[in-house]
C-alpha cells in the first residue's frame, strides 16, 4: 500500500512546505547526520551498528531537499495561486456561489496562519525528540510500564522480563557516546531555533542552572553519567530495585516529560483545531473546483489504500545537456563498484558471474543483463516492492524508488521528468538462480515467454509507411505537405533516407523536378 500524497494542497500549504516545514526537517536531520557520520567514521563497530539508521535518516533528508527544489522548479506555488484566483473570480460571479463556497479559501488561509505558529514545536518533537537521541524513545516505551509494575511477585517478574526484552532490542545497535552527542546537539538546536516563549520549562532550567548555564554538552554529559536509561547494564541494575521516585527524578525523563507535557498542554489542542479547519476548507474548495471545472477529472489521493498506476517505460531529460536512458545494466553496476563504500559493494560471487558473462536465460537479446528500468508510473512512499506488470499482466519488475526530480511528486506530478525506478524481474531471477543458487524457487515459477520488443513510435511510423508504399490504394493526398517556394511538396516521414526516397519514387516517379521533404531538407526523386 502507498503512503500519502497531497495533490490538492493549497498555495499556503506549498509555501509553508517550502519556507518552513521542509527546511526545518532538513536542518535537524543535517545535524543528526553530522553527529552520526563523525562517530561512524571513527569506529568500524559503530559504522555497522548505525548504517541502517543513517540511511533512514538520510533518505527523508534528501527527500525534503529534492521536494523543495522540485516545487520551486515547477513553480507549483504560482500554479496553485493562479487556480485559487480563478476560483475566487468564479465564486464571486453569483451570490449563491458566495454563500456556498465563499469562505473556503479564507478558512484555509487562517488555518495555515495558525499552523505556522505551532509548526516548529511539532517538527522538533518528531525530529529532534522521537527521532533524535534514542534515550527519549526508550523512556517513552518503558516509563508507563515501570510506573504500573504489578504488586504480585510473579506478575512483576514477568513484566520486568518484558522490559528486559525491550532493552535488549533497543541497545543491540546502540552507542552511548554517539547518543550523548545527539542529545546535546539536537537539544541545542531546539533551544536555538524555537522561540523561548514556545519552549518547555526544562529548557529555561538548563539555561539558568548554575552548573550547565546553557551548555548543552555539559548537560548531556551529566545526563548520560547519571541516568539508568542510557545503557543496558545500567537499566538492568535499575530493574533489580525499580523505583518510580528514581524514574521521575532522572534528568533524561524530566526533559522528555517536560517536552511532552508542553506539547499536550499548549500545542495538541491547537493542532487539532488546525486539522479540523484544514479539512473543512479543503472539502469546500475541492467541491467548488469540481463544480467550476465539470469536465476535469479529479482523482482522489487514495492515501494508504490499494491503487493502480499506469505508465510507459521511457528515458527522460531533466535539464539542459542532461539525458538518462531508461535502463541500467550489469556493466553499469560494475563501473560503480567500490568495496570501500557499503552502498557500492559488489560481492565476490557477483563479480565472478560478471566476468564469466554467466547470465543464463536472463540476458536480453543483445546479451546484456538489465538491472533497473524507469517508467512514468505515479508512485509515492510505501510503494517499494509494488509489482510492475506489462500489457500482458506479466510481472516485469518491482518498484523501489523515484528519481531525484520525482521528490516533489507527492504534491505535484510532472509526467515529463518524474520516473519510477524498478528492478527488472530478470535480474531478480538471476540473483535467485545464479547468485543464490535457489533454483527450487525458480522451478516453482511460471516464466513468461520471450516477446518481441514493442516498436518505438518512429519505428512504427516507418513500418506503416513501408506498408503504404506497397499498397495500391495509397495516394499522395494521404501525406502531409509543406510550402516550398510557393509549391506544396509532400513530407515523407521515414526512419531512413533510403526508405523515404523509395516511397517518394514509388508514389511520384523518378524526376528531377519532383520534390519531397525529409527531415529538414528538400530532395528530388531523380535516380542517379
Map each language-model feature to its residues.
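Terminal presequence/propeptide segments associated with secretion/organelle targeting
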Residues: 1-473
Amino acid at each position: 500500500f502507498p503512503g500519502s500524497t497531497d495533490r490538492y494542497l493549497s498555495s499556503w500549504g506549498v509555501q509553508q512546505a517550502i519556507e518552513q516545514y521542509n527546511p526545518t526537517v532538513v536542518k535537524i536531520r543535517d545535524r543528526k547526520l553530522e553527529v552520526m557520520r563523525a562517530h561512524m567514521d571513527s569506529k568500524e563497530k559503530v559504522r555497522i551498528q548505525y548504517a541502517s539508521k543513517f540511511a533512514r535518516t538520510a533518505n527523508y533528508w534528501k527527500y525534503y531537499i529534492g521536494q523543495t527544489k522540485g516545487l520551486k522548479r515547477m513553480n507549483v506555488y504560482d500554479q496553485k495561486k493562479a487556480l485559487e484566483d480563478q476560483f475566487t473570480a468564479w465564486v464571486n460571479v453569483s451570490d449563491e456561489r458566495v454563500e456556498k463556497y465563499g469562505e473556503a479559501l479564507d478558512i484555509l488561509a487562517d488555518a495555515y496562519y495558525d499552523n505556522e505558529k505551532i509548526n516548529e514545536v511539532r517538527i522538533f518533537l518528531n525530529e529532534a525528540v522521537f527521532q533524535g537521541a534514542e534515550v527519549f524513545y526508550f523512556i517513552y516505551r518503558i516509563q508507563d510500564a515501570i510506573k504500573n509494575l504489578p504488586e504480585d511477585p510473579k506478575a512483576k517478574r514477568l513484566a520486568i522480563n518484558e522490559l528486559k526484552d525491550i532493552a535488549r532490542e533497543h541497545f543491540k545497535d546502540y552507542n552511548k557516546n554517539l547518543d550523548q552527542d545527539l542529545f546535546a546537539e539536537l537539544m541545542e538546536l531546539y533551544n536555538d531555533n524555537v522561540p523561548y516563549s514556545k519552549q518547555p520549562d526544562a529548557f529555561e532550567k538548563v539555561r539558568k542552572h548554575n552548573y550547565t548555564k546553557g551548555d548543552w554538552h555539559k548537560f548531556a554529559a551529566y545526563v548520560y553519567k547519571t541516568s539508568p536509561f542510557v545503557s543496558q547494564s545500567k537499566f538492568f541494575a535499575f530493574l533489580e530495585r525499580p523505583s518510580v521516585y528514581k524514574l521521575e527524578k532522572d534528568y533524561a525523563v524530566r526533559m522528555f516529560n517536560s517536552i511532552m507535557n508542553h506539547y499536550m498542554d499548549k500545542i495538541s489542542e491547537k493542532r487539532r483545531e488546525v486539522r479540523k479547519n484544514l479539512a473543512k476548507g479543503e472539502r469546500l474548495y475541492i467541491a467548488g473546483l469540481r463544480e467550476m471545472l465539470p469536465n476535469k477529472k479529479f482523482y482522489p489521493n487514495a492515501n494508504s489504500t490499494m491503487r493502480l498506476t499506469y505508465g510507459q517505460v521511457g528515458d527522460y531529460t531533466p535539464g539542459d545537456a542532461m539525458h538518462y536512458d531508461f535502463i541500467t545494466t550489469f556493466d553499469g553496476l560494475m563501473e560503480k563498484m567500490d568495496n570501500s563504500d557499503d552502498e557500492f559493494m559488489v560481492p565476490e560471487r557477483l563479480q565472478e558471474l560478471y566476468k564469466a558473462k554467466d547470465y543464463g536465460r536472463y540476458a536480453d537479446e543483445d546479451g546484456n543483463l538489465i538491472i533497473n528500468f524507469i517508467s512514468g508510473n505515479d508512485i509515492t512512499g510505501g510503494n517499494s516492492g509494488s509489482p510492475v506488470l506489462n500489457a500482458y499482466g506479466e510481472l516485469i519488475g518491482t518498484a523501489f524508488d523515484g528519481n531525484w526530480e520525482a521528490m516533489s511528486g507527492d504534491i505535484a506530478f510532472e509526467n515529463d521528468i518524474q520516473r519510477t525506478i524498478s528492478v527488472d524481474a530478470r535480474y531478480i531471477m538471476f540473483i535467485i538462480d545464479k547468485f543464490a543458487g535457489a533454483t527450487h524457487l525458480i522451478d516453482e515459477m511460471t516464466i513468461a515467454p520471450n516477446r518481441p520488443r514493442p516498436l518505438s513510435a518512429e519505428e512504427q511510423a516507418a513500418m506503416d509507411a513501408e506498408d503504404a508504399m506497397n499498397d495500391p490504394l495509397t495516394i499522395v493526398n494521404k501525406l502531409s505537405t509543406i510550402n516550398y517556394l510557393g509549391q506544396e511538396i509532400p513530407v515523407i516521414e521515414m526512419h531512413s533516407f533510403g526508405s523515404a526516397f523509395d516511397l517518394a519514387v514509388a508514389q511520384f516517379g523518378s524526376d528531377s523536378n519532383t520534390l519531397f521533404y525529409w527531415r529538414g531538407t528538400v530532395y528530388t526523386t531523380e535516380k542517379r
